[in-house]
UniProtKB/Swiss-Prot annotation:
Cleaved signal peptide residues: none
Sequence positions bearing Phosphoserine: 100
Keywords: Isomerase, Magnesium, Metal-binding, Phosphoprotein
Assigned EC number: 5.4.2.10
Requisite cofactors: Mg(2+)
Protein's name according to its UniProt entry: Phosphoglucosamine mutase
Length: 447
């Protein structure tokens, strides 16, 4: 069997690729593998707003109960709430049912260990081995030893209170727009900002099971960009479906991506003496403009492979406190063990208030190099063709020579979809756009 787990859990089209049977198997194997000691294990289960969440939750919970574990149902809460509440409630593990920013037909199952971290590859492989062994040695308790399901009604409130306490100021006097992507943040984000005194304007906070991420949220921020200007807001935030990431919009309606957010937060933490070793952890996809800006502030960058799990690994290795991705996954390790869209939004808003400057002013210290990202749809078994085909390899070398050190080519297979991402950076937008599309078309012609 191929590896079940991708870069962000098990993901696929719900009911064909990610079936109720697979969810049951993951619940049963996961509860068994992640339980330490002889006590009755407690596993938290949450979901985003997509229609398939009910089906997968029912199956997953059945699997958990079948090995005698307790399933604590959190309902619809953001992914980072699961990471936080797993620690807060002293659970053995947490599970989030979500496909994050993917369209509604997708769903996913992602595990957290008892410390709120995503699982290591070894633990994921251990879960898969149990499933492949047809649950050899896994108990099937009967009678009073079976597991029970319990609904935790305070989950959303507990997470929201935690997020609010990560900033030292209230937000009175600020006008803030939120795009909740019809996803998991539709209650918590609005409540947190209103409780802190902000004047809040909200769009896409009416999930119906089918409209998550649909032309909204961090993958489609255009509506929010217009809305911020229309309502005269100081800034806005767009979350993705499970709210583990967010992007910002300044008062002029300009999109502020994760690179700018990281620069802003790193610079502020350095100023107040809280940026460990003056170091920020980012991925190879971060813009070269971030390197230049951070150098000017005396901030060092550690770079990892793409994926917030690799950022987190680097952060925990050396106890760095801030890291993230251009896509808006930002990890504040002093507060949470995963990317947290609400915590990120609150940090940015509090910095804007503390500095008494507009978001556009605060971001003007960084200049982005033009960057083009083109997705080429490639079957999973052909994702490495860019490394193996001599014509593609030569084309990449030619582009790098043309860029002459001011720019770069980065090709990355997606860990969750049948895509290869072709990214070019350089000084001339039109030139790199043409080269990126040419390279993507060359890759497509070879499959």
């Amino acid at each position: 069997m191929d590896r079940m787990f991708g870069t962000d859990g098990v993901r696929g089209i719900a009911n064909t690729e990610l079936t109720a049977q697979i969810a049951y198997n993951l619940g049963r194997a996961g509860a068994y593998v992640l339980t330490e000691g002889a006590h009755k294990p407690k596993i938290l289960v949450a979901k985003d707003t997509r229609i398939s969440g009910d089906m997968l939750e029912s199956a997953l919970v059945a699997g958990i109960l079948s090995v005698g574990a307790e399933a604590v149902i959190l309902g619809v809460v953001p992914t980072p709430a699961v990471a936080y509440l797993t620690r807060e409630y002293n659970a053995d593990a947490g599970v989030m049912i979500s496909a994050s920013h993917n369209p509604v037909e997708y769903n996913g199952i992602k595990f957290f260990n008892n410390k709120g971290y995503k699982l290591s590859d070894e633990l994921e492989d251990g879960i898969q081995k149990v499933i492949e062994s047809d649950f050899e040695g896994v108990p099937s308790p009967i009678g009073i030893d079976l597991g029970r399901e319990r609904i935790e009604v305070a989950a959303l409130e507990d997470y929201t209170e935690f997020a609010k306490q990560t900033i030292p100021y209230n937000l009175k006097g600020m006008k803030i727009a939120l795009d909740c992507a019809n996803g998991a943040s539709y209650k918590s984000a609005v409540k947190a900002f209103r409780d802190l005194g902000a004047d809040v304007f909200v769009i896409n906070d009416n999930p119906d099971g089918t409209n998550i991420n649909k032309n909204c949220g961090s993958t489609h921020p255009e509506e929010l960009m217009d809305y911020v200007v229309k309502k005269g807001c100081d800034l806005g935030f767009a979350f993705d479906g499970d709210a583990d990431r967010c992007l910002a919009v300044d008062e002029n309606g300009k999109l502020i991506n994760g690179d700018f957010i990281l620069m802003l937060c790193a610079n502020y933490l350095k100023e107040i003496g809280k940026l460990k070793d003056d170091t920020l952890v980012v991925t190879v996809m971060s813009n070269l403009g971030l390197d230049i800006a951070c150098r000017g502030f005396g901030i060092k960058l550690e770079k990892t492979k793409v994926g917030d799990r690799y950022v987190l690994e680097e952060m925990t290795k050396d106890n760095y406190v801030l890291g993230g991705e251009q896509s808006g996954h930002v990890i504040f390790l002093d507060y949470n063990t995963t990317g947290d869209g609400l915590v990120t939004a609150l940090q940015v808003a509090s910095i804007v208030k503390k500095k008494e400057k507009t978001l556009s002013e605060l971001c003007s210290v960084m200049k982005e190099l033009p960057q083009v990202l083109v997705n080429a749809t490639v079957p999973n078994d052909k994702k490495n063709i860019y490394l193996e085909d001599t014509e593609i390899v030569e084309a990449i070398k030619e582009i790098e020579a043309k860029l002459n050190g001011v720019g770069r080519v980065l090709i990355r297979p997606s860990g969750t979809e049948p895509l290869v991402r072709v990214m070019l950076e350089g000084e001339n937008q039109a030139e790199i756009d043409e080269m990126a599309h040419g390279l993507a078309n060359l890759i497509l012609s070879k499959i």
